[in-house]
Amino acid sequence: MSSCSSLSMDDRVKIGYGSIAGASLSIIGSIGTIILIKIRNKKQEKKLLIQRKQQLSINNLNINSGSSSNIITISNSTTSLSSNNLNIQPPSFPSYSPLPTSISLSNNNNNNKNNNQKTKVSHFIINLSIANLLASIFMITIKLMMIHFNDKFIKVLPSTANHSFNALISVCTIGNGVIGFSFISTFFWTLAISMYIYQQFLSSSTINSNNNNNNINNINNNNNNNINNINNSKNNNSINNFNNSNKSNKIIKMLFYFVCWVIPFVLGSILVSGSRLIELNSDLPWCSIDSNIQLISFYFPLIICLLATTFFTILIKYKFSNDKLACSSSSLINLQSKIIQRLILFLIVILVCWVPSLISFFISFFSKNCKQFLWLEIISSTIQSCQGILNFLSYLSIFKKLKLYFKNLKKKFNNNNSNNSNNSNNNNSNNFNGGGIFYSKGKKVNNQNSNNFYFTFSTFDFDNNQIQEK
């Protein structure tokens, strides 16, 4: 979508093939990301269903055996504390009416609906992958038509032939709009991921703090009314929280859809209106976008999204550093750390893909002769088309695994050169777990959070029930 015409026909062909190569890889990466998320979500749903059935069986067994009087329910189907573990004496009355099975079933159903209706990070990544997929498909189609079907590429539609020159509609001008729409949508969805994760970090800290205070107050109440008060308050709170969160999540979801799809579509339409045909008498006619319109409708939203995503990522990192000192849950710390690592990778991807394009645009924008560098144009066009495949690699944490692999390889090489064979063997056993890049470190591997190398980020739904200590 360059606004200059200083490059030759051969130069534009080279740039076009670079974009086609990068877009082809991005199609593979975008489809792979969507498939992996869908598979992981199915596995998570089956796992949660099994856990709910097991919890329901335990509740029914406790009710039938009469031993449920020693169980204090703290959260819906997720955490239970024994009165013996809390050093609280059981109620002095001989027996009481336990919680009916129907209430347990109702709570399980509410939790299931609540989890399904939560706005999840994996859902945001799917939309980001769809936007990358559309951008790649449009990029390949437009570039191939420009190179091999140029007569149809610049052919003006009959309905617009009698209009002004800048308003001529062709495949070329429409292509500028749809490519711009898709790429702008990727900017907005990347920003949406960082904003949503930051909001979840804040809300999870607040909810956990309130839940802990309420649990302590409820446990310190009169032992005779302790269980009834907790059950009644939690049932009422679960219903109210479900209704409120359901409404708020629907509003948030619709807002994100509007911002990340509708607004980019409007901006893409502006790019179409700002496109014009140039070099009609050359061997490879093409169309360009007015530099001012391109700045306002494309690069200005890009700059805003880059700055905002960086800002929210820094806030999340700062928030995590503060919460880490006060949090005693190692599993929660590991989960939050993985979320931040992948968010940083997504930020790095969008910076790597679009900073060269920004540099190229502003060089031509402020130069008098619309100066362009062929090598910079090829790099920027190729890398920006690779956003989908780079997001896919970030989703798999390939970069971190490669770094760990080469670090361990260096340690292994140093250990082999050491004269102390015992220390060498110990270091090798500590540094390697399976000896390949598709495995985690051998030290302190959390089976619950590191079961599968390929499916990590899709588990970071960060629902309130998931972030509590189990």
UniProtKB/Swiss-Prot annotation:
Glycans are attached at residue 162. It is a multi-pass membrane protein. InterPro entries: GPCR_Rhodpsn, GPCR_Rhodpsn_7TM. Signal peptide: none annotated. GO terms for biological process: adenylate cyclase-activating G protein-coupled receptor signaling pathway. The keyword Transmembrane applies. The chain crosses the membrane at residues 17-37, 124-144, 177-197, 254-274, 296-316, 343-363, 373-393. Belongs to the G-protein coupled receptor 5 family. PANTHER family: CYCLIC AMP RECEPTOR-LIKE PROTEIN D, G PROTEIN-COUPLED RECEPTOR 157-RELATED. Receptor for cAMP. This is Cyclic AMP receptor-like protein D. It comes from Dictyostelium discoideum. The lineage of its organism: Eukaryota, Amoebozoa, Evosea, Eumycetozoa, Dictyostelia.
